[in-house]
Amino acid sequence: VAAWCVWQTWPSDASGMRHTAVVVEQLTWHEVTADNRPVLYFSSAEGDSALTGITSVRDSATHRRLTMGFWTNSLPLMPTCRGRVVAPYAAEGGVPRSLNDSAIVRLCRLSADIQLKRLQTQKSELDYYIRVHGVQDNGYQQIAALANSIKRAAIAVRTARNIIDSLAADKKHRHRFALCTKATFSVTGHDDEGKTVRIPMHLVSRDSTLRLAVLQTSDRSTPDWAKPAKLLPWDASTSRSVLSVATPGLGVHGIESDTVSPIIVQGTLQASGQHNLPRLRAPDGAPVYTRRGHFIGLVNGKQIVARREISKLLKK
C-alpha cells in the first residue's frame, strides 16, 4: 500500500506533463428547428429582436474555439480518469426561448433580407473592380476569390429564405418552430510516438461560475498514452514558481493550431491565485504544475483554478 501511495503521488516529468495536456476544440452553432428537425442555422441572436447570419449551411454559422485542457483522475490516489478531460467552456451567446412560430419566421425572413441586401452591395462593388482590372493586376485573384465566396454565401442565404417561406406556407401541416444551440467537442493530443491523435468527446457537466466543463470519451476509456493529472488532497495555493504545459498561440486567429506539440512555460503563482504566465504561451485551460512536477490547477484568465475546485467539479 505504501509503495502504491508513493507511486500515485510521484511528480510528473516533462514527458508526463505533455501527455496530460490536450487541445480542446469546441464547435458551437445555433439552429432553427421545425418539428424538432434542424432546417436553418444562424450565427447569433440579438435578444428577441434579431437573428444574425441566417443560412442553410451549418459550417457558415459555426463558431470554432480552441483551448487547452487536460486528462484528470477524480480521486487522489486511484486511477479514476475514465476518459475525462477538464477544459474551459464558452457559451456562444444565448437564443430567445419564448418566441412563437410567427415571430421566428419573421426574424428568419428579416435576417435573410438584410444579408441579401448587404451581399448584393458587396457583389456589385467587386464586380466593378473585376470589370476595370485585368488578371495581371496585383490583388485580382484575391478579389475574384472573394467574389466567389460572396456568391456562395448569397446562394446559402437565398436557400434559407426559400426554406422558411416554404415551411411557413405549408397549409397541410402547421410546423412548430424553435431556436436552440448545439455544440460538439473533440480533443487533440500526441501519442508516445509523437503522432497527432484526435478523439471526439461529449459534454458531461459544466460550471457557469468557473466557466469550466467536464468532457468524456464515448466509451469512458482513457488512451494508453494519456497521463491523467493527480488531484492530491492537500492545499497547494502558496506563492511559488510554477510550470505550465500548453500549445502556444491558441485563441490568436491566424497562428493557432491544434497539431503543434505543447511546450513547458515557467511562471509564478501568488497566494491569491494570480499568475504571470504569458497568455500567448499559456492560454486558458493549460495545466499548471509545481517546479517538481505536482499538478496544482489550470490557467483561467489571470487566475489559476486550484485542484480542489477541479475535484469539486468532477463530483457534480
Predicted regions and their residues:
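Hydrophobic membrane-insertion alpha-helices, especially the h-region
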Residues: 1-6
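Flexible, gly/ser-rich surface segments that form the specificity/activation loops bordering the active-site cleft
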Residues: 10, 64, 194-196, 223-281, ...
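Active-site-proximal beta-strands of protease catalytic cores
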Residues: 20-25, 82-89, 237-251, 284-307
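Conserved active-site neighborhood of the chymotrypsin/trypsin-like protease fold
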Residues: 79-98, 138, 142-241, 251-253, ...
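A conserved glycine-rich beta-strand in the N-terminal activation segment of trypsin-fold
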Residues: 10, 34-36, 51-89, 198-202, ...
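Ser/Thr/Pro/Gly-rich low-complexity linker/stalk segments immediately outside membranes or between
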Residues: 8-21
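Active-site loop architecture of trypsin-fold serine endopeptidases
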Residues: 92-111, 115, 154, 168, ...
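Mixed-charge, low-complexity intrinsically disordered segments
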Residues: 34-61, 98-177
